[in-house]
Amino acid sequence: MDKRTEMVAGASRIFDLEGFRGVGIDRVIEPSGVSTRTLYKHFGSRDGLVLAVIEARHARFMQQLTLESGTDDPIGSLFDTLHEWVAEHGARGCMLLRARSEYASACEAVVTLVQQQKQEFLREVSRRVDLALGRGDEALALQIWLLFEGATASASVASITVINEAKRAALLLLQLAGDNVA
């Protein structure tokens, strides 16, 4: 693993567990054992590192979705992937939204990147709705996206089983949309 990748991985763990803005730079670089100078050489700033971390996190999640995209249940598998992700990484809500919240007035680049990533995920949900129904349904895609985002947040304050309930609701909405084809 190269230094840049190592710094992103180490900072990702720290940011995920301890937050973004309230953690000192020495703590952020501690897992990779690099100097502050090395951090600035690779990322230009702390915000540059934050951007790299949320880019990597989003890419990993989207890759995880791609790995299971061959399933015959394109909507249910979204929630199965979320369940696996939360079981592996912990239920702390969406790291991207936490970054956006902490940087809302401090770094427009973080806010913009998270918005773009959420739109990319909504497009993926929409693509899966198209696969499941054989036609587009943007309202249904938005509803399923909201269930997914809500389950991600709710799992952090309730039980991971809320993901299963969100899956059931999404599949019911999908069934209703399929039944209402004229």
Model-derived segments and spans:
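Helix-turn-helix
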Residues: 6, 10-48, 52
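Short amphipathic alpha-helical elements of helix-turn-helix/winged-helix folds
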Residues: 10-14, 85, 124
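Amphipathic alpha-helical interaction segments
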Residues: 48, 77, 81, 95-98, ...
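Hydrophobic alpha-helical connector segments
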Residues: 52, 63-92, 141-144
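Short, basic, alpha-helical segments at the C-terminal edge of helix-turn-helix-like DNA-binding modules
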Residues: 55-61
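Amphipathic alpha-helical packing segments from all-alpha helical-bundle domains
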Residues: 62, 67, 73-76, 106-132, ...
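Amphipathic alpha-helical segments used for helix-helix packing
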Residues: 88-112
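Hydrophobic/aromatic-rich alpha-helical bundle segments in the mid-to-C-terminal region
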Residues: 109-116, 131-182
